[in-house]
């Protein structure tokens, strides 16, 4: 199972209006400073692990944050979201994560006219690994290390190639 696309981003930091497509195997976010790479990672972490946006995440605190994700999965994973799947592809679901105000939590639903609710418990069981952006990469991202970040990076490389 993987996030194939972030279809819609509304009112979240500097990413409003952006569409982000992901590869099913491995993705790299590369670019200049302050263009939103970390914001993309934090968006995924907030939606799939934390479940609540902070006041600083809202571009305009009078408007809700709305994020629309397309998640694809294998035949073996059919049923993970119970009877919910996209009509045009039974191996995918388009999820909406929406937080109406700073004081609330994110609500999740299947993007259909019925807006079938998806529980946070279901969302949290998806495998999301969040690795925080480093400020001193030369010291912290060292593939020679056998503990900490080096261990994680080596594991990801060995099991992804």
Predicted regions mapped to residue ranges:
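Pre-Walker A-like glycine/lysine-rich segment at the N-terminus of P-loop NTPase domains
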Residues: 1-46
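Beta-strand secondary-structure signal
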Residues: 6, 66-70, 94-96
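Short acidic, glycine-rich loop/turn motifs
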Residues: 8-11, 71-75, 99-100
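Solvent-exposed residues in well-ordered beta-strands and their adjoining turns
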Residues: 23, 70-74, 134
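Core residues of folded domains in eukaryotic genome-function proteins
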Residues: 25, 65-67, 127
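Conserved P-loop NTP-binding catalytic core
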Residues: 41-90
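Glycine-rich phosphate-binding loops of NTPases
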Residues: 55, 75-161
